[in-house]
Amino acid sequence: MRSLALYMCACVIALTGGRALADDWNVYLTVDNQFDVYYGTSMTTTFAAGGGSNWMVEYNFSATGRPTTDYLYVATSSDHSGAQGFIGTFHNTTLNATLSTGTTGWQVFPAGQHLPQLFGMPGSWPASQMPTQTQVDAAIAYATANSLWVAPSTAPGYDNDPSTPIAPYSFIWPTALPNIQTSAQWIWYDSGKDTSVSSVLPIPLRGFNHDEFLVFRVPGAVPEPVTAVLLGVGAVLFGRR
């Protein structure tokens, strides 16, 4: 039985091509209004890749030698007016795998709901103020420890293709970003507190304080289904006598 388990482990290695223990990344994104990109564990950031504050710019950052267990984090803030959103494409060059905003796996934590617990801070987070890395780390640890990560929200048609129909609304980001997939979606968090009516932008992409600051995250890499199954079977067989 042990020989079978060893055979199964060998199959995993063969199927994954000797999976590297570190990943390289090349990312393109923008945020209306401000953001910082980090990599790290489920509890804290360990590397700051960069940031930006001009939604008209497509920002590009790279990261090399990141652990395969890393999460990719994007901390954001807005000016609470006009429009707000986050869009990007993230390419794992080691695996030749690409993920974009709007795909499954993305999560968001609205830190503004928990400012007293996080920082002993009453009231709301100030508009147009980015959190420090230490504050982002505190938010990540609190969200993970209390299972507070939720799925982000979007609005139909708000992708990186300005020709996608969005009636009766308007597309206020009129130019496609050249290195972001056209299927990538503008995402944000919907607090459910904006009850206003607008013919320009839908909720949650029109300006409003949806419990900012926000921290988005996505797992950097997960085992392919066949790999996960073989690993599980191998572990069971290896443990049997």
Placement of each model-derived feature along the sequence:
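C-terminal membrane-anchoring or membrane-association module
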Residues: F238-R241
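Short, surface-exposed beta-strand/strand-loop-strand elements in extracellular ectodomains
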Residues: Q34-M43
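Accessory carbohydrate-binding/adhesion or oligomerization-edge regions at the termini
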Residues: D23-W25, T30-D32, R66-A221
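Exposed aromatic-hydrophobic patches
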Residues: V57-T64
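A generic "binding-loop/recognition-motif" signal
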Residues: N33-Q34, G234
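Solvent-exposed serine/threonine-rich low-complexity stretches and specific carbohydrate-binding patches
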Residues: T45-G52
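Short, threonine-centered small-residue motifs that mark membrane-proximal processing/anchoring sites
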Residues: R2-A5, C9-D24, V218-L231
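Residues that act as N-cap/strand-start positions at coil-to-secondary-structure junctions
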Residues: V31, S53-V57
